[in-house]
Amino acid sequence: MTKSIIREIGPLALNFQDDKVLIFFGDNAPSELREYSIIHDVEVFNQNDFSAGAKLVIGKYVYEIEAVGGEAANNMSKLGHLVVYFTEVPDEILPGAVYAAPHIFPIVSNGEEVLITL
């Protein structure tokens, strides 16, 4: 299981609702990206969780991971960085991306858990 807690929601982090994208970063997010990011504390990390078929839970929203870019687990491990797309999986998967279904943009709040588990 991979588990994190949402600590801060950048003032522009939810501006990607129409694109159905959430950007997560650890507390070390670069200042130029922090306002666009959801800052979270990764409490537990398991690289094996980052695979198609895993479950992603954000607060009360439950998703199935449909595809994972080759760098997503590494980015999460080192930077707490994860980009989640609630869209169809494209032909070319972005290296740091996770694609989740259903394609519904979640409402997120400070203090909520983010879980990824097989």
Predicted regions and their residues:
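Short, structured beta-strand/loop micro-motifs enriched in basic residues and often containing a Trp
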Residues: 33-45, 91-100
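Short, conserved beta-turn/loop elements at beta-strand boundaries and strand-helix junctions
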Residues: 61-62, 68-74
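Short, well-ordered loop/turn sites that connect or cap secondary structure elements
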Residues: 48-51, 56-57, 108
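Conserved "cap/hinge" positions at secondary-structure junctions
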Residues: 59-60, 118
